[in-house]
From Swiss-Prot:
HAMAP family cross-referenced by the UniProt entry: Ribosomal_uL24_A
Listed name of the protein: Large ribosomal subunit protein uL24
Region of interest (Disordered), residue spans: 85-111
Upper lineage: Archaea, Thermoproteota, Thermoprotei, Sulfolobales, Sulfolobaceae
Entry function: One of two assembly initiator proteins, it binds directly to the 5'-end of the 23S rRNA, where it nucleates assembly of the 50S subunit. Located at the polypeptide exit tunnel on the outside of the subunit.
Single biological process term from Gene Ontology: translation
Keyword Ribosomal protein listed: yes
GO cellular component: large ribosomal subunit
Subunit structure: Part of the 50S ribosomal subunit.
Organism of origin: Metallosphaera sedula (strain ATCC 51363 / DSM 5348 / JCM 9185 / NBRC 15509 / TH2)
Biased composition, class Basic and acidic residues, residue ranges: 88-111
Keywords: Ribonucleoprotein, Ribosomal protein, RNA-binding, rRNA-binding
Length: 111
């Protein structure tokens, strides 16, 4: 189960392709930072921290006092998903279910 803290909006291209606006972030998704000092940085999600609602992005690090690099944790609401990892069949089912539900809602509003 994906924590409600870990839901992020899809990019405009993905939103049109999949017919939904947001989905839970998973490891190996590609995201773009949309707020803060690291605005515009794009990379692959390496770790997900459901308890704090934050993620670690490949290449987004800082150095500790002793010189070892550590990931900068970014809140999931401050990123935009640019590429989905669809290797998991359960996630494909979630995407299909959300997309069909979205189409039904749009069809009902048009009438």
């Amino acid at each position: 189960m994906v924590s409600s803290k870990l839901i992020a909006p899809l990019s405009d291209e993905l939103a049109k392709e999949y017919g939904m606006k947001r989905i839970g972030i998973r490891k190996d998704d590609t995201v773009r930072v949309m707020r803060g000092d690291n605005y515009g940085f794009e990379g692959k999600v390496t770790q997900v921290f459901p308890e704090s609602g934050r993620i670690a992005i490949e290449g987004l690090t800082r150095k500790k006092a002793d010189g070892t690099p550590v990931y900068i944790k970014i809140h999931a609401s401050k990123v935009e998903i640019t590429k989905l990892n669809t290797n998991d069949p359960r996630r494909k089912d979630i995407i299909n279910r959300k997309a069909s539900r979205q189409k039904e809602e749009q069809g009902g509003k048009a009438q």
